[in-house]
From Swiss-Prot:
NCBIfam families: PRK14175.1. GO terms for cellular component: cytosol. Catalyzes the oxidation of 5,10-methylenetetrahydrofolate to 5,10-methenyltetrahydrofolate and then the hydrolysis of 5,10-methenyltetrahydrofolate to 10-formyltetrahydrofolate. Pathway: One-carbon metabolism; tetrahydrofolate interconversion. Belongs to the tetrahydrofolate dehydrogenase/cyclohydrolase family. Its EC number is 1.5.1.5, 3.5.4.9. Homodimer. NADP(+) binds at residues 165-167, 190. One of its GO terms (biological process) is L-histidine biosynthetic process. It comes from Staphylococcus carnosus (strain TM300). PROSITE patterns: THF_DHG_CYH_2. Keywords: Amino-acid biosynthesis, Histidine biosynthesis, Hydrolase, Methionine biosynthesis, Multifunctional enzyme, NADP, One-carbon metabolism, Oxidoreductase, Purine biosynthesis. This is Bifunctional protein FolD. The gene is folD.
Length: 285
């Protein structure tokens, strides 16, 4: 068996076309979605990622801006910028690029974002809504994973899913989304014993811990769906996933590559949530 490759680049491209059509329809009503991104400091990876978000937003007809603060910016300065964006009626969605410098509390900043503009889905209010099945902004990587699975017509009802990683950014929210689709979910983490035992029984595996080579061919049963969220740069700067891709694709039923799998879907869901934010505040959703 050779796995079906879940091509995040192509799926994202098709999805963005649908978003672009919706943006154009909104513009005809007099509304243009706007995404504002706060970047503190000059981390190369963060700067590159923020620029790619801006470019993607503008490509589908949105307005986007980067609010770039110095590495030495105080917490108060960051919070003041957030307050300005919260109160700016032209801004549909706000996200703060992490990590933040040590003098700025990430939690305090995330909690200061207006929940109605929180397109990353990290505000406690939106996290809470997710867990009681209310409409809300869902964190973008988990949302992108679910769209990949949906696009591939993967039926999750009654399936055994194993999620490796329990972060609030990926592991926990994607587990909740899988449960919403009636999967039976097991979460593994650094204290879990005999991970291979659980992996071998899984119909779906989502690995999101950033440990290259963690999931091997021997861990995966034939026909399983494998979603690799890992993107760790090696000594040459090449991104490596958590999964031994070349080996695992020989037994898996479907698999995401790294890069080009989950990554493009994450940025696409930032755009999706920005559009949703604009629709909701205009009473159109």
């Amino acid at each position: 068996m050779v796995a079906k490759i879940l091509d995040g680049k192509q799926i994202a491209k098709d999805y963005r076309q649908g978003l672009q059509d919706q943006v154009e329809a909104l513009k005809e009503k007099g509304y243009t979605p706007k995404l504002s991104v706060i970047l503190v400091g000059n981390n190369g990876a963060s700067l590159s990622y923020v620029k790619s978000k801006k470019k993607a937003a503008e490509k589908i007809g949105m307005i986007s801006e980067i609010v770039h603060l110095e590495e030495t910016a105080t917490e108060e300065e960051v919070l003041n910028e957030l307050e300005r964006l919260n109160n700016d009626d032209s801004v549909s969605g706000i996200l703060v690029q992490v990590p933040l410098p040590s003098q700025v509390s990430e939690q305090k900043v995330l909690e200061a974002i207006n929940p109605e503009k929180d397109v990353d889905g990290f505000h406690p209010q939106n996290i809470g809504k997710l867990y009681i099945d209310e409409q809300t902004f869902v964190p973008c990587t988990p949302l992108g994973i679910m769209e990949l699975l949906k696009n591939a017509d993967i039926d999750l009802d009654g399936k055994d899913a194993v999620v490796i990683g329990r972060s609030h950014i990926v592991g926990q929210p994607v587990s909740k989304l899988l449960i919403q689709q009636n999967a039976t979910v097991t979460i593994l983490h650094s204290h879990s014993k005999d991970m291979s035992k659980y992996l071998k029984e899984a119909d779906v595996i989502v690995s999101a811990v950033g440990k290259p080579g963690l999931v091997t061919k021997e861990d995966v049963k034939e026909g399983a769906v494998v979603i690799d969220v890992g993107n760790t740069p090696d000594e040459n700067g090449k991104l490596k996933g958590d999964v031994e891709y070349e080996d695992v694709k020989e037994v898996a039923g479907a698999i995401t590559p790294v890069p080009g799998g989950v990554g493009p879907m994450t940025i696409t869901m930032v755009l999706n949530n920005t559009l949703l934010a604009e629709k909701m505040r205009r009473g159109l959703e």
